[in-house]
Amino acid sequence: MSVGGFFSSGFTRQPKGLVGYVLTAYAALFVLWSAYAAVFSRLDALVLVTLFLSFMLVLVFSTIAAVSERPEDDPEGIPVYDWFFVLFSICCGVYFALNADAIATRITLLDPLSVTDITFASLLIILCLEVCRRTVGLLLTGIVICFMVYNLYGHVLPAPFGHGYIGFEHFLDIMIFTTDGLFGTPLRVAATYVLLFVLFGTFLANAGGGEFFNNLAASVAGARVGGPAKIAVVSSGLYGTISGSPTSDVVTTGSITIPMMKKIGYPATVAGAVEVAASTGGSILPPVIGSAAFKIGRAHV
């Protein structure tokens, strides 16, 4: 596998017919519910993030395939194994939402986990790892797995690399049944603040915001030496103020600026690097300032 293969994600499928209509309605209802819940709902925080994660898992398994390239004989629709992933995602969300009070009141590492707790916790971790692989690639997923293995087997390593014994139940207790693991600050921020700003940025971009920023950048830097590269930097910075996402920034502005840079002689790798660097910097500009700022702010409250 090439280096790029470690970063490759699954191809995006677009189911048609009844399944496509159902998924579209599901996604719309999910966005509306999430926006309402983030602002007005008095749901317990654990219930909110549990349902949010479950809904997101269902969307990923429904729309992103397990492989990076679409096979020639690939039928349109969702494979049977992905329907099982969808079912497992729903079951995990329902289980943890129904048991939110028991989870919130239990004493960590003292109250034992039941067999059902261990089963659903293990299943949820597997589902999240698979979603990570499909959306980001093998590299980040491999790093996460390495740290998980280190947690479980680090006690066999010599000093200074080893640590005290951590059993599997202990590991699940911290990762799933406390706010220091999967249901911690990053997911809570994503389910509240980040979702609203990404929703705002999406509406603005589809209303012509991305084209406006590109035109504004072209008027400022288009006539200068290295104009297309400067247009990429300025437009990505401006678009980053409303998206907060380097990925959406690259997709929106890069689809215009990268071909412009290649047309005047920039190597493809340089053109891509300029756009990626500009989009990454643009994602931390106010007012959205990326999700990291919200995570930092919430951690210090």
Region spans (language model):
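Hydrophobic transmembrane alpha-helices of multi-pass solute/ion transporters
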Residues: 73-77, 104-199
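Conserved small/polar residues in nucleotide/adenosyl-binding loops
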Residues: 299-301
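C-terminal ends of transmembrane helices
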Residues: 62-73, 128-133, 205-211
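Conserved, well-structured core domains of diverse proteins
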Residues: 1-111, 118-122
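Short hydrophobic alpha-helical membrane-embedded segments
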Residues: 23-27, 115-123, 227-231, 267, ...
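Hydrophobic alpha-helical transmembrane segments of multi-pass membrane proteins
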Residues: 119, 187, 200-204, 238-245, ...
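Hydrophobic transmembrane alpha-helices that form the pore/transport pathway of multi-pass ion
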Residues: 214-282, 288, 292
